[in-house]
């Protein structure tokens, strides 16, 4: 009976109490807490980033200074060459090429040095140095010029077949059509001097097939007609 009385006395309209919702920390608060807990690692990370930025800036400034110094030395060497002082110019070109390796001025100096050697009859020395230069994988425009100089040096040594190959390599390295065509004309000439008529004809036909818009095209037509007797 007591149990029934308790049940009957209960108010069926009363609802169970809902516990209050307790909100957790906000995203910003969690971020602040994480930063405080990891401030040591954050400081290290920021230090690394700052070091990378500073190193990059320093290397950029150093590279620019190196390039400027190299250009100044190169211009002085050119001035000596223009004045007819080839021994002084040669020494300065060598200095720029070795001291400022990798700069535009160093590439120019290496080519100017070997051009001077051709003019002074040092073709074999030029051949040896130019082959090393080309083997160092310089930018295409310098590889092309070096190949042309190498071909000329080999022609001076009466090595027409090797010269033809050097000119072909220069053509392959060239980026502009006119430069490719000029190198192929030189290749045909060198091959012809060595009695390699088939290679000479092939070089000329490449000009006629691929580089019709260049100034070398009519020259190639004439030389091919001479070699093939119009056939």
For the regions a language model picked out, list residue spans one by one.
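TPR-repeat structural position
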Residues: 86-87, 123, 160, 197
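Short solvent-exposed coil/turn linkers within tandem alpha-helical repeat scaffolds
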Residues: 65, 97-106, 134-143, 171-179, ...
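N-terminal positive-inside, membrane-proximal cytosolic segments immediately preceding the first
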Residues: 2-48
